[in-house]
Amino acid sequence: MSKKTYQPSKIRRNRSHGFLVRSRTKNGQAILRRRRAKGRKRLAV
């Protein structure tokens, strides 16, 4: 039997989906903008 594909790691999670990573790129900023407009409690991770 193969192992599960999701092996949680806080560091990896933050490095790929964290706020700083999102705010670095144009598209990431667009994501944050959309989530703010929608009223999300958590903008990133």
From Swiss-Prot:
Keyword entries, A-Z: Ribonucleoprotein, Ribosomal protein
Taxonomic superkingdom: Bacteria
Sequence ranges of Basic residues compositional bias: 32-45
One CC-aspect GO term: ribosome
Molecular-function annotations in GO: structural constituent of ribosome
Region listing for Disordered, in residue ranges: 1-45
InterPro entries the UniProt entry points to: Ribosomal_bL34
Disulfide cross-links: none
Pfam family for this entry, one: Ribosomal_L34
One example of a Gene Ontology biological process annotation: translation
Gene3D superfamilies: 1.10.287.3980
NCBIfam families: rpmH_bact
Family in the record: Belongs to the bacterial ribosomal protein bL34 family.
Name listed for the protein in its UniProt record: Large ribosomal subunit protein bL34
